[in-house]
């Protein structure tokens, strides 16, 4: 892509593969969240009507859970290098009040800030916990009754934590930080957004746009 086209259309934030995988994980999680409420909480049983009925939900929930886990493992492999914490992340954490108050940090942030990395690792841990605790619920014969009850309790607790994290993630991506969503729908963000929220990454992308086209996460110091 030419320098002028890069400036006119915005900066490539996420590749097509990244976007497809992100939305696959997001949509499978949304199904798991809704079906999880239906299965686990009697007052939410009305959700069955929107999800194909109780028998269908109980059949699909663990299968979609496996699909979600596979997608998240692929996402972990894809973004692992970008999600490693560094000195800038510690500085970002110290400047957290400014970020919460203004939606912007004074730290020279790269492609992902410490908050995004923190949420990513939170999702990795809780996703793994949901898969592990979900197995005894899918195959009750794997463990004794007492362990099954513990797995069920942990599954519920981790599920609620994950839902809370998901709500915060959606809020920050839409209401708190306008201009973020286009990066995950069309792949591009404005140059102003990139320079304001991820200045270090923005400078690297600006430099790279003059040369051979590179993947959005390929520019690392």
Language-model-detected regions and their locations in the chain:
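Membrane-embedded alpha-helical bundles that constitute the cytochrome b-like, heme-associated redox core
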Residues: 1-221
């Amino acid at each position: 892509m030419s320098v002028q086209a890069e400036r006119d259309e915005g900066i490539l934030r996420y590749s097509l593969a990244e976007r497809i995988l992100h939305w696959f994980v997001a949509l499978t999680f949304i199904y798991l969240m809704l079906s999880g409420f239906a299965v686990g909480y009697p007052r939410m049983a009305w959700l069955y009507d929107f999800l194909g009925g109780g028998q269908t939900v109980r059949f699909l929930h663990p299968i979609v859970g496996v699909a979600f886990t596979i997608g998240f493992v692929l996402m972990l492999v894809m973004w692992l290098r970008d999600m490693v914490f560094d000195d800038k992340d510690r500085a970002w954490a110290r400047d957290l009040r400014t970020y919460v108050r203004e939606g912007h940090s004074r730290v020279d942030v790269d492609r992902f800030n410490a908050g995004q990395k923190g949420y990513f690792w939170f999702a990795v841990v809780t996703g793994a916990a949901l898969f592990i605790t979900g197995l005894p619920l899918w195959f009750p014969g794997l463990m004794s009754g007492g362990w099954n009850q513990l797995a069920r309790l942990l599954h519920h607790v981790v599920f609620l934590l994950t839902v809370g994290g998901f709500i915060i993630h959606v809020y920050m991506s839409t209401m708190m930080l306008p201009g973020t969503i286009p990066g995950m729908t069309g792949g591009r963000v404005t140059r102003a957004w990139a320079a304001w929220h991820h200045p270090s990454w923005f400078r690297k992308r600006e430099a790279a746009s003059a040369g051979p086209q590179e993947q959005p996460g390929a520019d690392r110091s």
